[in-house]
UniProtKB/Swiss-Prot annotation:
Family per similarity comment: Belongs to the MraZ family.
GO molecular function, one term: transcription cis-regulatory region binding
Pfam family, one: MraZ
Keywords for the protein's UniProt record, in alphabetical order: Cytoplasm, DNA-binding, Repeat, Transcription, Transcription regulation
Segment forming the signal sequence: none
Protein's organism: Haemophilus influenzae (strain ATCC 51907 / DSM 11121 / KW20 / Rd)
BP GO annotations: negative regulation of DNA-templated transcription initiation
Disulfide bonds: none
Name of the protein in question: Transcriptional regulator MraZ
Length: 151
């Protein structure tokens, strides 16, 4: 399970180091194999351990090729999906198109979302968090979507 937001750096070759606290789990369950793709709603990347990605692939496979919206989702998610293998130093290589989509430069944020990571430009991340907090403070959290949620 991946939790928390960690500042990491992208090196000159496009590699990012997975924080040490997550490496053993990724190696044990997935032999260091991960899949990275784009987020369809925001300018970040989604990084899945291989076993979690395989669940997503099955869901995408079940979508209709004849429904334009479902087909677009398949095209974007699968079309950008790139296998990433952790090297001996715990780094993964992010392809150029993925880095471009998320506007990645040197400073990144690796954000745990339990079954996956989001990878953000540090600038985009801080902007997004500020917006989320602002919207959250002006939103009625008693909305139906959160009725059964408690902290």
């Amino acid at each position: 399970m991946f939790r928390g937001a960690t500042a990491v750096n992208l090196d000159s070759k496009g590699r990012v180091a997975i924080p040490t606290r997550y490496r053993a789990e990724i190696l044990e369950k997935n032999q260091g194999q991960m899949v990275c793709t784009v987020d369809i709603r925001q300018s970040c990347l989604l990084l899945y351990p291989l076993d979690e990605w395989e669940k997503i692939e099955q869901k995408l496979l079940a979508l209709s090729n004849f429904d334009p919206t479902q087909r677009r989702l398949q095209r974007v998610m699968l079309g950008h999906a790139t296998e990433c293998e952790m090297d001996a130093q715990g780094r993964i290589l992010l392809s150029g198109p993925l880095r471009q989509h998320a506007k990645l430069e040197k400073g990144l944020m690796l954000v745990g979302q339990l079954n996956k990571f989001e990878i953000w430009s540090d600038v985009e991340w801080h902007t997004q968090i500020a917006e989320d907090i602002e919207i959250g403070s002006s939103t009625d959290f008693a909305a139906d979507a959160l009725n059964d949620f408690s902290l």
